């Protein structure tokens, strides 16, 4: 299983709405938001899922998302 922390940068003031959408995605755990323009989450990808696919999916989730950056990436046993 691939475990990746991500920081999602949004347009100013849009982090709360993006955080709500991220919290509904399967395999993602929302860790918090600064309430303005940043959301932090951790993803647990199973079955050969790729980090690039996650980053693309998050980037396409909402037009208010400006950038998605991985912060930490590690492998864990399933």
Region annotations inferred by a language model:
Residues 1-78:
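Long, contiguous binding/interaction regions
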